[in-house]
Regions:
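C-terminal segments of large proteins
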Residues: 1-149
Length: 149
């Protein structure tokens, strides 16, 4: 978990607590999940559970006035490389799920935003990745405790 604007700013310092500002109801938490694989993998699934006290911000819903930029076909890598490898993220109430039919060897950073809603100390479950047809190939991150004050 990181503060506002993590991936684009180059400073992705992890945070383990957040103080809610009553004057700023739009505070966001940027979550970055890093996946590294030494070899090509098939049928990969990556699941990341969100901590209680937060909600996933679904940017695919057109419910706000945020402006989105169209992709420029003359500059396909302007927003990074490899965005087409993963299928669209599946958003559930308590977790997100990314899938990929083929994942070339390398390092990938998957990001999403959380909206803190309740104060308290909450357990962050480990993110986990596995090959769907080869469950013996799997990995997970570390769990943590996240505090919203």
């Amino acid at each position: 978990l990181a503060g506002d604007g993590c991936p684009g700013d180059g400073d992705c310092s992890p945070i383990d607590s957040l103080t809610l500002d009553p004057d700023d109801p739009s505070q966001m938490i940027m979550v970055a999940v890093t996946v590294t694989t030494a070899q090509d993998l098939y049928h990969v699934m990556l699941e990341d559970a969100i901590p209680s006290g937060t909600e996933i911000l679904d940017t695919t819903l057109l419910t706000s006035q945020t402006a989105t930029e169209d992709d420029d076909p003359r500059r396909p890598f302007e927003n990074g490389w490899g965005w087409w490898i993963f299928n669209p993220v599946q958003i559930f109430d308590d977790h997100l799920l990314w899938t990929a039919e083929f994942l070339p060897a390398g390092t990938y950073i998957l990001t999403y935003q959380l909206l803190p809603t309740h104060r308290g100390a909450f357990q962050v479950l480990p993110a986990r990745a596995w090959q769907y047809f080869y469950p013996e190939v799997q990995g997970s991150s570390a769990g943590d405790v996240f505090t919203i004050e």
